[in-house]
């Protein structure tokens, strides 16, 4: 079994993934930004479950907007274990609103959490993984980078950048025996605080000038809910199960990309073609070896 660090484990996909991996017998480090205050309830619940069920699950503070915090969390794992086998990049935040009404600070903050946060954690974890010449970086992306719905502009941009960073990082770390998997969930409307807890554009002076579109924005959650066929649920557990399946696969057999989308938007077909095109171009450049994990 593996030792796995998960970012953003207080709710939703991160929480379900922590529990699912613990049930499977992995040693899980469920990290969250503010375990002493905002996330205290989640900490208490996870610790109680771990005691009751005998899970090897620990809660560790990790604020992905801080390099020092990322490095401290990884050190904590390495001090207690024989090594870190996998990182699940899950931390992220949704913003809803009119693109023009997002200030540069709004957009910078969203990129800082959703995109640069994963890079910080990689910088903390990769020296160890490279020295062992093994490990898995698993990124929880989103189909939204393909479907690009209205009123989610900066969030869409942050997830597209997150995916691109995962891809280009994979070329380099593959030569040190490190695998990459990108799991792309569709809209998750149940079992998470994603939509209810969404942030909003802060420039109200601009936002009011778009007031005629407010009824559409207010339907964003409902609009995503109606995508699913009767009896179909868009629940974080389906994503957690796929993450558990991927991490259990033998070295060298993990899929580079997996789409988990109850809305069946066709993103799996789009990304299959996109990845084939990308890989063909990398081969034309003469860098084919970066597409395979080096033993």
Model-derived features: positions:
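A glycine-rich helix->loop->beta "capping" turn
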Residues: 53-56, 76-89, 95
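The beta1-alpha1 cofactor-binding region of Rossmann-like NAD(H)/NADP(H)-dependent oxidoreductases
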Residues: 37, 61-72, 104
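Conserved glycine-rich Rossmann-like NAD(P)H-binding loop of the short-chain dehydrogenase/reductase
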Residues: 24-42
